[in-house]
């Protein structure tokens, strides 16, 4: 009898374990599918946004055509000889369109009038590849003649060899040869076709070069910022090269990332870039930076390229590209009545840096004649000691003593981890928002892989509602109210504080981390995520 009972118990235990394992496997598979669906949804959302932008663009182009017909009508004064090629329906439509009085919008030709002399000025003189479109990421690589050594082949091998087969179908690499010497251009094309014939035929790699008529006269440029005449010419032409490449790439994908012809990349770079962008799909960013050097690894959303190109065309002779990009951000978000720190905080929400860097500069000999540049990205080989999130613009402060420049400001902006000497009771870390924010959740993570023991202990999380009176809150929430108006909503456990914010407390003016007991260890804060509530 005992044996029989034991057998039954064993059988029941086996069945229970089997069912539990089956349930867990089903749940895990379901979770993975959900994550995949979420990524597909975010990608679809981006494509829809780009489609809306392109419809608006086509509307603008149609308006330009109408303006041209108006000029034709005015010049011919309704001459039958000029219009007899059109059908009656077309003539009727033209009459309706041109009869409406409207203002004329300045175009690219206002800043580059020389383009009107040749109708092919904005058409690539050389175009190799099958014209792939509909990809996630377009990589743009401008290249010009170098006196000493070309790094282009090595750069392309690094980019291509670090792509998985499925990733090669979801991107396109556009090589822009910024030269008008046809013999040189054809020589570069021949080398690329020989080295990357498979990649070109598959659509992964495309090669273009501009017509000579695209460039204006660059011989009489004004020397500025102490640059020599040759350097001013070099940087001015470089701005024009970037613009041509961006215009060509704009309609090919969701994102455009600017690269150079003398770099190497990290493994898994494509997936890292794509996932980082999708994580930020609900944020209003303009530039994602995957390298700290110059214009390397700067990624934009395709619709934003229109604004960027227009801005560069307006000032292409005045300043280098990286300065112009910073001016765009300043114009968009900086308040002249506020100080520089406020401006930097606002720009940090549009210009988001990913660490560690995914691209390393390896070129020693610059494309500028005679220039040697020993530039390397110091973040390229660094381990990731902090996790980056986009947080609401805020003024940050702390009573803690900072260690070796690891400031709270840098942590909040995703540039470094915060490191402070032993906290004591009464110390605080304060995040005061520039304007009240509806917050959904929060996450504060202390310690890192190099110093896992430097964590926040006996520390609480507190929020200050924008409205001090008239809050419709539960008794449980009301009991958490402190004398200074803050509400205690959480605390650190094993170095981590994480939780949801009671919606009745929104909008929030500030977050505060308060140390309630002396600590025996130093403190590192390597992750800050104050997640805004979705509308």
Curated annotation (Swiss-Prot):
It catalyses: N(4)-{beta-D-GlcNAc-(1->2)-alpha-D-Man-(1->3)-[beta-D-GlcNAc-(1->2)-alpha-D-Man-(1->6)]-beta-D-Man-(1->4)-beta-D-GlcNAc-(1->4)-beta-D-GlcNAc}-L-asparaginyl-[protein] + UDP-N-acetyl-alpha-D-glucosamine = N(4)-{beta-D-GlcNAc-(1->2)-[beta-D-GlcNAc-(1->4)]-alpha-D-Man-(1->3)-[beta-D-GlcNAc-(1->2)-alpha-D-Man-(1->6)]-beta-D-Man-(1->4)-beta-D-GlcNAc-(1->4)-beta-D-GlcNAc}-L-asparaginyl-[protein] + UDP + H(+); an N(4)-{beta-D-GlcNAc-(1->2)-alpha-D-Man-(1->3)-[alpha-D-Man-(1->6)]-beta-D-Man-(1->4)-beta-D-GlcNAc-(1->4)-beta-D-GlcNAc}-L-asparaginyl-[protein] + UDP-N-acetyl-alpha-D-glucosamine = an N(4)-{beta-D-GlcNAc-(1->2)-[beta-D-GlcNAc-(1->4)]-alpha-D-Man-(1->3)-[alpha-D-Man-(1->6)]-beta-D-Man-(1->4)-beta-D-GlcNAc-(1->4)-beta-D-GlcNAc}-L-asparaginyl-[protein] + UDP + H(+); an N(4)-{beta-D-GlcNAc-(1->2)-alpha-D-Man-(1->3)-[beta-D-GlcNAc-(1->2)-[beta-D-GlcNAc-(1->6)]-alpha-D-Man-(1->6)]-beta-D-Man-(1->4)-beta-D-GlcNAc-(1->4)-beta-D-GlcNAc}-L-asparaginyl-[protein] + UDP-N-acetyl-alpha-D-glucosamine = an N(4)-{beta-D-GlcNAc-(1->2)-[beta-D-GlcNAc-(1->4)]-alpha-D-Man-(1->3)-[beta-D-GlcNAc-(1->2)-[beta-D-GlcNAc-(1->6)]-alpha-D-Man-(1->6)]-beta-D-Man-(1->4)-beta-D-GlcNAc-(1->4)-beta-D-GlcNAc}-L-asparaginyl-[protein] + UDP + H(+); an N(4)-{beta-D-GlcNAc-(1->2)-alpha-D-Man-(1->3)-[beta-D-GlcNAc-(1->2)-alpha-D-Man-(1->6)]-beta-D-Man-(1->4)-beta-D-GlcNAc-(1->4)-[alpha-L-Fuc-(1->6)]-beta-D-GlcNAc}-L-asparaginyl-[protein] + UDP-N-acetyl-alpha-D-glucosamine = N(4)-{beta-D-GlcNAc-(1->2)-[beta-D-GlcNAc-(1->4)]-alpha-D-Man-(1->3)-[beta-D-GlcNAc-(1->2)-alpha-D-Man-(1->6)]-beta-D-Man-(1->4)-beta-D-GlcNAc-(1->4)-[alpha-L-Fuc-(1->6)]-beta-D-GlcNAc}-asparaginyl-[protein] + UDP + H(+). Disulfide bonds: none annotated. The chain crosses the membrane at residues 5-27. Residues 1-4 are cytoplasmic. It is found in: Golgi apparatus membrane. Pfam families: MGAT4_cons, MGAT4A_C. Pathway: Protein modification; protein glycosylation. InterPro entries: Glyco_transf_54, MGAT4_A/B/C_C. GO terms for molecular function: alanine-glyoxylate transaminase activity; alpha-1,3-mannosylglycoprotein 4-beta-N-acetylglucosaminyltransferase activity; metal ion binding; protein homodimerization activity. Belongs to the glycosyltransferase 54 family. PANTHER family: ALPHA-1,3-MANNOSYL-GLYCOPROTEIN 4-BETA-N-ACETYLGLUCOSAMINYLTRANSFERASE A (PTHR12062:SF4), N-ACETYLGLUCOSAMINYLTRANSFERASE VI (PTHR12062). This is Alpha-1,3-mannosyl-glycoprotein 4-beta-N-acetylglucosaminyltransferase A. It comes from Macaca fascicularis (Crab-eating macaque).
């Amino acid at each position: 009898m005992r044996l029989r009972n034991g057998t039954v118990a064993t059988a029941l235990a086996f069945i229970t374990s089997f069912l539990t394992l089956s349930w867990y496997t089903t749940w895990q598979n379901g979770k993975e599918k959900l994550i995949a669906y979420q990524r597909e949804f975010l990608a679809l959302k981006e494509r829809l946004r780009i489609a809306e932008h392109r419809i608006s663009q086509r509307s603008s182009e149609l308006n330009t055509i109408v303006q041209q017909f108006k000029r034709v009508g005015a010049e011919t004064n309704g001459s039958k000889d000029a219009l007899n090629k059109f059908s009656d329906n077309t003539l009727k439509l033209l009459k309706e369109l041109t009869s409406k009085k409207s203002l004329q919008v300045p175009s690219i030709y206002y800043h580059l009038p020389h383009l009107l002399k040749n109708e092919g000025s904005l058409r690539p003189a050389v175009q190799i590849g099958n014209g792939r479109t509909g990809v996630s990421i377009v990589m743009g690589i401008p290249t010009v003649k170098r006196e000493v050594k070309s790094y282009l082949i090595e750069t392309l091998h690094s980019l291509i060899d670090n792509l998985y087969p499925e990733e090669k179908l979801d991107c396109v690499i556009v090589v822009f040869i910024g030269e008008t010497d046809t013999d040189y251009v054809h020589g570069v094309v021949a080398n690329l076709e020989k080295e990357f014939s498979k990649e070109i035929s598959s659509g992964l790699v495309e090669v273009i070069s501009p017509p000579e008529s695209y460039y204006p006269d660059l011989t009489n440029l004004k020397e500025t910022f102490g640059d020599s005449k040759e350097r001013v010419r070099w940087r001015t032409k470089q701005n024009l090269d970037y613009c041509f490449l961006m215009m060509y790439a704009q309609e090919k994908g969701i994102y455009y990332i600017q690269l150079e012809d003398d770099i190497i990349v990290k493994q898994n770079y494509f997936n890292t870039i794509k996932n980082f962008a999708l994580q930020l799909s609900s944020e209003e960013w303009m530039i994602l930076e995957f390298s700290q050097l110059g214009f390397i690894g700067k990624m934009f959303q395709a619709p934003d390229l229109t604004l960027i190109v227009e801005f560069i065309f307006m000032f292409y002779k005045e300043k280098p590209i990286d300065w112009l990009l910073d001016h765009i951000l300043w114009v968009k978000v900086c308040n002249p009545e506020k100080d520089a720190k406020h401006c930097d905080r606002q720009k940090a929400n549009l210009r988001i840096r990913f660490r560690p860097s995914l691209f390393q500069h390896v070129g020693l000999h610059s494309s500028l004649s005679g220039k040697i540049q020993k530039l390397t990205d110091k973040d390229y080989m660094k381990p990731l000691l902090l996790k980056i999130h986009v947080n609401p613009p805020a003024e940050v402060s702390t009573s803690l003593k900072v260690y070796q420049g690891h400031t709270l400001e840098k942590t909040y902006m995703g540039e470094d981890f915060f490191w402070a000497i032993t906290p004591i009771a009464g110390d605080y870390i304060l995040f005061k928002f520039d304007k009240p924010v509806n917050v959904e959740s929060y996450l504060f993570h202390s310690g890192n892989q190099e110093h896992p023991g430097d964590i926040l202990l006996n520390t609480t999380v507190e929020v200050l509602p924008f409205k001090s009176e008239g809050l419709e809150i539960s008794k449980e929430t009301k009991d958490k109210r402190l004398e200074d108006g803050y509400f205690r909503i959480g605390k650190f456990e094993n170095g981590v504080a994480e939780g949801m914010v009671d919606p009745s407390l929104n909008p929030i003016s500030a977050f505060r981390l308060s140390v309630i007991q002396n600590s025996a260890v130093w403190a590192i804060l390597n992750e800050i995520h104050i997640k805004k509530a979705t509308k």
